[in-house]
Swiss-Prot record:
Superkingdom per UniProt: Bacteria
Top-level EC class: translocase
Record PANTHER family: ELECTRON TRANSPORT COMPLEX PROTEIN RNFE, NA(+)-TRANSLOCATING NADH-QUINONE REDUCTASE SUBUNIT D
Phylogenetic placement of the source organism: Bacteria, Pseudomonadati, Pseudomonadota, Gammaproteobacteria, Aeromonadales
Protein known as: Na(+)-translocating NADH-quinone reductase subunit D
Localization per record: Cell inner membrane
Similarity field: Belongs to the NqrDE/RnfAE family.
Gene Ontology process terms (BP): sodium ion transport
Keyword Repeat: no
Length: 215
């Protein structure tokens, strides 16, 4: 039962209580760049989840034989190999989306979430829990991407996953889209708003002030 509860906590905590974007403020760059459309946000979320999960798994499996002096190089090699596989699969099965995501899939290699979980968790934990930790953090990251992507695409273009929800005035409808939501800075403000709301509702996530207490 203890193992089951621990596995459940490892998998689910990155959604709200320890979200990599909302609490740790990691992976912001890609969150700004790929969330103007749900298709790109979903694919990026899936790619990061797969890479984080399996990199954690493989690193945990060999953690006892990795020399401490080269552990970062080994971690980056494993992560880079997985990213190459994901990128090639994306090009093979969805070339148009691959072009839209451009360099951002390749930049998963340097994503702080992937490297951070490999170093902080996978190097110290058994394979199964490491895999769940990677999947959980990938899903937590993806949850925010999809939330931001939904708001930006619906308000910015009146569609969701490319499906028209509100007919725009340009097409004879009534909806006037807010093009500002399709610009990258809008994602920055949305994520900032989400962080503010979450930390207001969950004061324990607020950082201590310089005087050593939380307001």
């Amino acid at each position: 039962m203890t193992d089951h509860n621990e596995a459940k906590k490892v998998l689910l905590s990155p959604f709200i209580s320890n979200n990599p974007i909302m609490l740790q403020v990691l992976g912001i760059c890609s969150a700004l760049a790929v969330t103007s459309k749900m298709e790109t946000a979903f694919v990026m979320a899936l790619a990061v989840t797969v890479v984080t999960g399996f990199s954690n798994l493989f690193i945990s499996l060999i953690r006892h034989i990795i020399p401490n002096s080269v552990r970062i190089i080994v971690q980056m090699t494993i992560i880079a190999s997985l990213v190459i596989v994901v990128d090639q699969l994306l090009k093979a099965f969805s070339y148009e989306l691959s072009k839209q995501l451009s360099v951002f899939v390749g930049l998963i290699i340097t994503n702080c979430i992937v490297m951070g979980r490999a170093e902080a968790y996978a190097m110290k934990s058994p394979p199964w829990l490491s895999f769940l930790d990677g999947i959980g953090n990938g899903l937590g990251y993806g949850f925010i991407l999809l939330l931001v992507g939904t708001i930006r695409e619906v308000i910015g273009s009146g569609s969701w996953f490319g499906i028209t929800l509100f007919e725009t005035v340009n097409n004879g409808g009534w909806y006037i889209p807010n093009g500002m939501l399709l610009m990258p800075p809008s994602a920055f403000f949305l994520i900032g708003l989400f962080i503010w709301v979450l930390r207001t509702l969950r004061p324990e996530q607020q950082e201590p002030t310089e005087h050593g207490h939380k307001e």
